[in-house]
Amino acid sequence: MSKVIEMKEKVVAEITEKFEKSIAAVVVDYRGLKVEEVTELRAKFREAGVEYKVYKNTMMRRAARNAGMEEMVADLVGPNAVAFSYEDPVAPARILNDFAKNHKALELKVGFVEGSFYDEEKLKELASVPSREVLIAKLLSSFNAPMANFACLIKAIADKKTEQEA
Protein backbone atom coordinates (compact mmCIF):
# COMPACT_ATOMS: atom_id res chain seq x y z
CA MET A 1 0.00 0.00 0.00
CA SER A 2 1.33 3.45 -0.83
CA LYS A 3 2.25 5.94 1.86
CA VAL A 4 -0.39 8.40 0.64
CA ILE A 5 -3.18 5.85 1.06
CA GLU A 6 -1.84 4.91 4.51
CA MET A 7 -1.83 8.57 5.53
CA LYS A 8 -5.38 9.06 4.26
CA GLU A 9 -6.59 5.95 6.10
CA LYS A 10 -4.94 7.25 9.25
CA VAL A 11 -6.75 10.60 8.90
CA VAL A 12 -10.08 8.82 8.27
CA ALA A 13 -9.50 6.70 11.39
CA GLU A 14 -8.73 9.88 13.37
CA ILE A 15 -11.92 11.60 12.18
CA THR A 16 -13.98 8.46 12.85
CA GLU A 17 -12.61 8.31 16.39
CA LYS A 18 -13.48 11.98 16.95
CA PHE A 19 -17.03 11.43 15.67
CA GLU A 20 -17.42 8.43 17.98
CA LYS A 21 -15.89 10.03 21.09
CA SER A 22 -17.50 13.46 20.79
CA ILE A 23 -20.94 14.14 22.24
CA ALA A 24 -21.52 16.82 19.61
CA ALA A 25 -20.17 17.46 16.13
CA VAL A 26 -21.33 20.37 13.97
CA VAL A 27 -20.38 20.91 10.31
CA VAL A 28 -20.22 24.43 8.90
CA ASP A 29 -19.50 26.06 5.56
CA TYR A 30 -16.79 28.61 6.27
CA ARG A 31 -16.51 29.97 2.70
CA GLY A 32 -16.02 33.74 2.71
CA LEU A 33 -14.60 34.08 6.23
CA LYS A 34 -11.42 36.11 6.54
CA VAL A 35 -8.37 34.76 8.35
CA GLU A 36 -8.96 37.13 11.29
CA GLU A 37 -12.55 35.90 11.61
CA VAL A 38 -11.52 32.25 11.58
CA THR A 39 -8.85 33.03 14.20
CA GLU A 40 -11.49 34.74 16.36
CA LEU A 41 -13.79 31.73 15.98
CA ARG A 42 -11.00 29.31 16.90
CA ALA A 43 -10.27 31.36 20.04
CA LYS A 44 -13.93 31.12 21.11
CA PHE A 45 -13.84 27.38 20.55
CA ARG A 46 -10.64 27.04 22.56
CA GLU A 47 -12.25 28.87 25.51
CA ALA A 48 -15.20 26.47 25.40
CA GLY A 49 -13.07 23.33 25.02
CA VAL A 50 -14.33 22.67 21.48
CA GLU A 51 -12.05 21.30 18.75
CA TYR A 52 -12.40 22.92 15.30
CA LYS A 53 -10.85 21.25 12.25
CA VAL A 54 -10.95 21.41 8.47
CA TYR A 55 -10.76 18.06 6.67
CA LYS A 56 -11.23 16.94 3.07
CA ASN A 57 -14.86 16.08 2.38
CA THR A 58 -14.07 12.62 1.03
CA MET A 59 -12.31 11.75 4.28
CA MET A 60 -15.14 13.21 6.38
CA ARG A 61 -17.70 11.22 4.35
CA ARG A 62 -15.84 7.97 4.94
CA ALA A 63 -15.43 8.74 8.64
CA ALA A 64 -19.11 9.67 8.98
CA ARG A 65 -20.10 6.36 7.39
CA ASN A 66 -17.67 4.47 9.64
CA ALA A 67 -19.14 6.19 12.71
CA GLY A 68 -22.74 5.44 11.65
CA MET A 69 -23.60 9.03 10.72
CA GLU A 70 -24.98 8.39 7.22
CA GLU A 71 -27.40 11.34 7.40
CA MET A 72 -24.46 13.74 7.43
CA VAL A 73 -22.82 12.45 4.24
CA ALA A 74 -25.09 14.24 1.73
CA ASP A 75 -24.28 17.66 3.23
CA LEU A 76 -20.51 17.26 3.05
CA VAL A 77 -19.98 19.32 -0.10
CA GLY A 78 -18.07 22.57 -0.49
CA PRO A 79 -15.58 23.97 1.99
CA ASN A 80 -16.49 22.48 5.36
CA ALA A 81 -15.12 22.53 8.86
CA VAL A 82 -16.29 20.49 11.82
CA ALA A 83 -16.46 21.41 15.50
CA PHE A 84 -16.19 18.55 18.02
CA SER A 85 -17.25 18.87 21.64
CA TYR A 86 -16.41 16.23 24.21
CA GLU A 87 -18.05 17.86 27.26
CA ASP A 88 -20.82 20.36 26.45
CA PRO A 89 -23.29 19.11 23.81
CA VAL A 90 -24.63 22.60 23.07
CA ALA A 91 -21.34 24.56 22.93
CA PRO A 92 -20.46 24.09 19.23
CA ALA A 93 -23.97 24.95 18.01
CA ARG A 94 -24.23 27.97 20.34
CA ILE A 95 -20.80 29.38 19.43
CA LEU A 96 -21.33 28.86 15.70
CA ASN A 97 -24.86 30.27 15.74
CA ASP A 98 -23.77 33.37 17.69
CA PHE A 99 -20.79 33.84 15.38
CA ALA A 100 -22.97 33.41 12.26
CA LYS A 101 -25.25 36.24 13.43
CA ASN A 102 -22.37 38.71 13.01
CA HIS A 103 -20.61 36.93 10.13
CA LYS A 104 -23.09 36.10 7.39
CA ALA A 105 -20.49 34.07 5.46
CA LEU A 106 -20.56 31.30 8.09
CA GLU A 107 -23.34 28.79 7.46
CA LEU A 108 -24.45 26.01 9.81
CA LYS A 109 -25.03 22.78 7.89
CA VAL A 110 -25.59 19.63 9.93
CA GLY A 111 -24.56 18.02 13.16
CA PHE A 112 -24.88 15.17 15.58
CA VAL A 113 -25.60 15.65 19.26
CA GLU A 114 -25.51 12.60 21.50
CA GLY A 115 -26.25 10.31 18.55
CA SER A 116 -29.14 12.35 17.11
CA PHE A 117 -28.96 14.01 13.70
CA TYR A 118 -29.60 17.76 13.55
CA ASP A 119 -30.17 19.82 10.42
CA GLU A 120 -29.59 23.58 10.26
CA GLU A 121 -33.00 24.43 11.77
CA LYS A 122 -32.60 22.05 14.71
CA LEU A 123 -29.05 23.29 15.33
CA LYS A 124 -30.34 26.86 15.60
CA GLU A 125 -33.03 25.71 18.05
CA LEU A 126 -30.41 23.86 20.07
CA ALA A 127 -28.20 26.94 20.13
CA SER A 128 -31.01 28.97 21.71
CA VAL A 129 -31.23 26.63 24.71
CA PRO A 130 -29.70 28.37 27.75
CA SER A 131 -26.47 26.99 29.18
CA ARG A 132 -26.52 24.32 31.87
CA GLU A 133 -25.60 26.86 34.55
CA VAL A 134 -28.47 29.17 33.57
CA LEU A 135 -30.95 26.28 33.57
CA ILE A 136 -29.78 25.16 37.01
CA ALA A 137 -30.07 28.73 38.33
CA LYS A 138 -33.63 29.00 36.99
CA LEU A 139 -34.55 25.66 38.53
CA LEU A 140 -33.12 26.62 41.91
CA SER A 141 -34.84 30.00 41.87
CA SER A 142 -38.15 28.28 41.13
CA PHE A 143 -37.56 26.04 44.16
CA ASN A 144 -36.63 29.06 46.25
CA ALA A 145 -39.62 31.24 45.27
CA PRO A 146 -42.30 29.40 47.33
CA MET A 147 -40.04 29.39 50.39
CA ALA A 148 -39.35 33.11 50.00
CA ASN A 149 -43.07 33.81 49.65
CA PHE A 150 -43.79 31.71 52.74
CA ALA A 151 -41.11 33.60 54.69
CA CYS A 152 -42.66 36.93 53.64
CA LEU A 153 -46.09 35.68 54.73
CA ILE A 154 -44.78 34.64 58.17
CA LYS A 155 -43.04 38.01 58.55
CA ALA A 156 -46.25 39.86 57.58
CA ILE A 157 -48.25 37.88 60.16
CA ALA A 158 -45.62 38.58 62.82
CA ASP A 159 -45.64 42.30 61.95
CA LYS A 160 -49.44 42.40 62.11
CA LYS A 161 -49.47 40.73 65.56
CA THR A 162 -46.83 43.19 66.77
CA GLU A 163 -49.02 46.09 65.59
CA GLN A 164 -52.12 44.64 67.28
CA GLU A 165 -50.30 44.20 70.59
CA ALA A 166 -49.01 47.75 70.55
UniProtKB/Swiss-Prot annotation:
Keyword rRNA-binding among record annotations: yes
Keyword RNA-binding on entry: yes
One GO CC term on file: ribonucleoprotein complex
Gene3D superfamilies: 3.30.70.1730, 6.10.250.290
SUPFAM superfamilies: Ribosomal protein L10-like (SSF160369)
MF terms (GO), sorted A to Z: large ribosomal subunit rRNA binding
A Gene Ontology biological process term: translation
Keywords assigned by UniProt, alphabetized: Ribonucleoprotein, Ribosomal protein, RNA-binding, rRNA-binding
Pfam family membership, one: Ribosomal_L10
Origin superkingdom: Bacteria
Function: Forms part of the ribosomal stalk, playing a central role in the interaction of the ribosome with GTP-bound translation factors.
Subunit structure: Part of the ribosomal stalk of the 50S ribosomal subunit. The N-terminus interacts with L11 and the large rRNA to form the base of the stalk. The C-terminus forms an elongated spine to which L12 dimers bind in a sequential fashion forming a multimeric L10(L12)X complex.
Family: Belongs to the universal ribosomal protein uL10 family.
Protein name, UniProt field: Large ribosomal subunit protein uL10
Phylogenetic lineage: Bacteria, Bacillati, Bacillota, Clostridia, Peptostreptococcales
